């Protein structure tokens, strides 16, 4: 009889192990319920036979007790079993317990301590009835047949898509909850006298533990935690965060149903119990395991969090909302849900940074992982905002012509600054203003331009024109400041220096530049651009020189209109050396210059063009007359070879001196070079004198005159 009961109990235990390994598939739950109903009918027929029938085995609770024994490892789990004692004590059955046989069971997959499962009396069988059949007196067995075939590892089943389970989720969820409630009610109704001996005669381990139940559980679970981290976790050891080992690490949604889960007690169970009042004695600690205090007791294993993953995927597909996203604490290490999180992160708006900052303010001290993730989000949002602001950059180019080629870099920096300012205005953590850019007017201008473009886009929805006027005034002031900025044109290949000097109102520098130019260069400057033309007009001296040069060009092009016979000869004074003393004494009457029509010295009427040249000639003649009054008897006048002004020279010494104080050129009359004294001329005389030529007033000249 004992061997038969042992075989049946082992078959029940193996059936439950199969149920636990296949619990992630909802299709198996329907078969489990059908088989349990079938065995309940058989158990009802056997209940009428008496005490010879096999006792009811609560497979789930036995597995839980096996878990308690195996999870404690070397520390004895006897006290833990004692804490999970049964409440309903049958006093009549205690007297008969000593004679009843006891059976020793071990978990087929573990090598820990064995647990005793005694025979149960018929009176106890009547108490182990499911809630829906409490009125009936037929017990029910939770047994499933062995399933043959290739077993699938639990870790491989994590890759099962939720789309395959979506159709059967609603229909099979109710059956799953009903089966869970059946198992829980079985646990509640199991009597505390489950062992075949009295408490005094129970088998006790050789070494008993002095730790409390919570300490034993936490110690054993810490050992399992180390194993799970070595096998399945990618968590960095340097990061200390108590929230790493929550179910949030795989399912980051905290709902009310999460508080009802007993994942921290049933770490190998993938079932989530929603009944808060179900079997509170079997729970090692409070059910609210979401706080930081119980985070150390929660295991990060894929099997224990399978249902959490399924619920997270269900809530994400069926009812996605951005508000749930705001209330989560995103995990630092989650190799199972990183792909789904990154897909949702790509759809964030540009204000992700400010949203995360607000979340950090409410949560308190920021975490290291959250900081890294926030920088990642900010980098992604910055890249998105840079792509979106390319259109706004074209608008700002229409509003303000930026000549600097490096302004694109400053524009990118200013866009980042403006984004930082917008996000800081929302979060209130940072304060940024133009005071930080007080010494960089160029950056101020670029910043104002980008802020204006952003406000312009905001004003499309709500029309406020007064803000636009304020922006225009700020930009005008900054442009005035930027006009005097030194070094803002650095790096440009071509630069209009004269225009820049004009904008800075540096007229004295422009006057020096124009004075160094010739009249011909001034005419060329006039033809360059409108700005350069205005520069020449503003300088009166340069403009006068330009006009005079133009008149000379016209005179040279049209030629002289003078028809006087000796007009050409009189201009060449070097060829008229014999009559030079006579020409110095000639005068032009002043009455002729006052007449309406200009007359030549010989009484001929001249055209206006010819009169201008004669006027110039008359001024030269007046200079010669003025200098001739100061001549000595042995001196004569000769034009200076450099400035053509009257110069005094001595024929015997062959030396001349310019009368103009500005020139004062001392030259040799023969070679027209600088006076060199008694030395021979470096080059031949300007005009070698003929031997027949005689000095005026000499005997040879008198003879020549007589001969004529």
Curated annotation (Swiss-Prot):
Q: Give residues annotated as binding Zn(2+) 1.
A: 640, 643, 658, 663
Residue sites binding Zn(2+) 2 per the record:
668, 671, 676, 681
The pathway to which it is assigned is: Protein modification; protein ubiquitination
Residue ranges of the ZBR-type zinc fingers? 636-684
Q: In which tissues is it expressed?
A: Expressed in the testis.
Give me the stretches of Basic and acidic residues compositional bias: 399-411
The cellular component terms of Gene Ontology attached to this UniProt record, alphabetical and capped at eight, are: nucleus
The answer to keyword Nucleotide-binding applying to this record is no
Feature: compositional bias, Polar residues: 327-337
Q: Which UniProt keywords apply?
A: Disease variant, Meiosis, Metal-binding, Phosphoprotein, Ubl conjugation, Ubl conjugation pathway, Zinc, Zinc-finger
Where does the record place the modification Phosphothreonine?
Answer: 234
Domain F-box intervals: 490-547
One GO term in the molecular function aspect is: zinc ion binding
Name the associated disease, please.
Oocyte/zygote/embryo maturation arrest 12: An autosomal recessive disorder characterized by infertility due to early embryonic arrest.
* Its job: Required to establish and maintain the arrest of oocytes at the second meiotic metaphase until fertilization. Acts by inhibiting the anaphase-promoting complex/cyclosome (APC/C) ubiquitin ligase. Probably recognizes and binds to some phosphorylated proteins and promotes their ubiquitination and degradation. Plays a vital role in modulating the ubiquitilation of CCNB1 and CDK1 during gametogenesis.
Protein name per the record: F-box only protein 43
The gene for this chain is FBXO43
């Amino acid at each position: 009889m004992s061997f038969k009961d042992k075989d049946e109990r082992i078959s029940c235990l193996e059936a439950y192990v199969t149920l636990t390994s296949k619990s992630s598939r909802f299709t198996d739950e329907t078969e489990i319920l059908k088989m349990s109903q079938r065995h309940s009918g058989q158990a009802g027929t056997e209940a009428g036979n008496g005490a010879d029938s096999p006792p009811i085995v609560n497979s789930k609770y036995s597995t839980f007790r096996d878990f308690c024994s195996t999870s404690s490892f070397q520390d004895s789990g006897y006290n833990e079993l004692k804490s999970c004692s049964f409440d309903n004590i049958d006093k009549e059955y205690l007297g008969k317990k000593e004679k009843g046989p006891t059976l020793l069971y071990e978990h087929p997959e573990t090598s820990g301590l064995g647990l005793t499962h005694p025979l149960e009396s018929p009176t106890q069988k009547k108490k182990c009835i499911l809630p829906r059949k409490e009125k009936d007196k037929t017990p029910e067995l939770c047994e499933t047949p062995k399933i043959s075939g290739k077993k699938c590892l639990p870790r491989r089943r994590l890759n099962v898509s939720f789309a395959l389970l979506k159709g059967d989720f609603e229909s099979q969820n109710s059956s799953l909850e009903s089966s869970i409630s059946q198992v829980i009610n079985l646990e509640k109704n199991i009597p505390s006298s489950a062992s075949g001996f009295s408490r005094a005669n129970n088998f006790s381990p050789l070494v008993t533990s002095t730790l409390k139940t919570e300490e034993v559980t936490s110690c054993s679970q810490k050992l399992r935690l180390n194993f799970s981290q070595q096998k399945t976790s990618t968590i960095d050891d340097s990061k200390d965060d108590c929230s790493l080992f929550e179910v949030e690490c795989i399912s980051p949604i905290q709902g009310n149903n999460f508080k009802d889960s007993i994942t921290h007690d049933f770490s190998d169970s993938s079932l989530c119990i929603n009944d808060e009042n179900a079997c509170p004695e079997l729970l090692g600690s409070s059910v609210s395991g979401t706080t930081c205090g119980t985070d150390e007791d929660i295991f990060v294993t894929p099997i224990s969090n399978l249902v959490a993953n399924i619920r997270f995927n269900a809530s994400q597909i069926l009812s996605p909302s951005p508000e749930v996203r705001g209330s989560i604490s995103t995990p630092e290490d989650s190799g199972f849900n990183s792909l789904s999180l990154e897909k949702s992160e790509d759809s964030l708006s540009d204000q992700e940074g400010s949203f995360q900052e607000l979340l950090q303010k409410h949560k308190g001290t920021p975490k290291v992982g959250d900081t890294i993730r926030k920088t990642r989000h900010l980098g992604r949002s910055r890249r998105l905002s840079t792509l979106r602001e390319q259109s706004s950059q074209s608008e700002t180019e229409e509003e303000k012509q930026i000549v600097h080629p490096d302004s694109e870099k400053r524009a990118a920096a200013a866009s980042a600054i403006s984004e930082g300012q917008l996000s800081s205005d929302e979060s209130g953590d940072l304060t940024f203003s133009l005071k930080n850019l007080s010494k960089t007017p160029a950056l101020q201008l670029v910043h104002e331009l980008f802020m204006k473009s952003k406000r312009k886009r905001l004003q499309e929805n709500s029309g406020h024109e007064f803000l636009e006027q304020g922006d225009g005034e700020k930009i005008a002031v900054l442009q005035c400041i930027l006009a005097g900025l030194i070094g803002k044109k650095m790096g440009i290949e071509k630069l209009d220096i004269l225009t820049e000097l004009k904008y800075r109102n540096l007229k004295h520098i422009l006057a020096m530049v124009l004075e160094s130019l010739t009249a011909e260069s001034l005419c060329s400057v006039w033809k360059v651009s409108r700005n350069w033309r205005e520069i020449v007009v503003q300088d009166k001296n340069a403009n006068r020189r330009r006009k005079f040069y133009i008149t000379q060009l016209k005179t040279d092009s049209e030629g002289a209109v003078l028809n006087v016979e000796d007009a050409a000869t009189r201009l060449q004074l070097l060829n008229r050396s014999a009559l030079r003393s006579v020409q110095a004494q000639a005068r032009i009457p002043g009455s002729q210059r006052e007449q309406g029509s200009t007359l030549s010295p010989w009484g001929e009427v001249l055209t206006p063009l010819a009169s201008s040249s004669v006027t110039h000639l008359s001024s030269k003649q007046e200079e010669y007359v003025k200098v001739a009054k100061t001549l000595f008897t042995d001196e004569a006048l000769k034009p200076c070879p450099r400035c053509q002004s009257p110069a005094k020279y001595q024929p015997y010494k062959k030396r001349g001196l310019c009368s103009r104080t500005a020139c004062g050129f001392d030259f040799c009359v023969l070679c027209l070079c600088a006076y060199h004294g008694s030395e021979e001329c470096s080059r031949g005389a300007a005009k070698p004198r003929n031997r027949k030529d005689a000095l005026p007033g000499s005997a040879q000249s008198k003879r020549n005159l007589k001969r004529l």
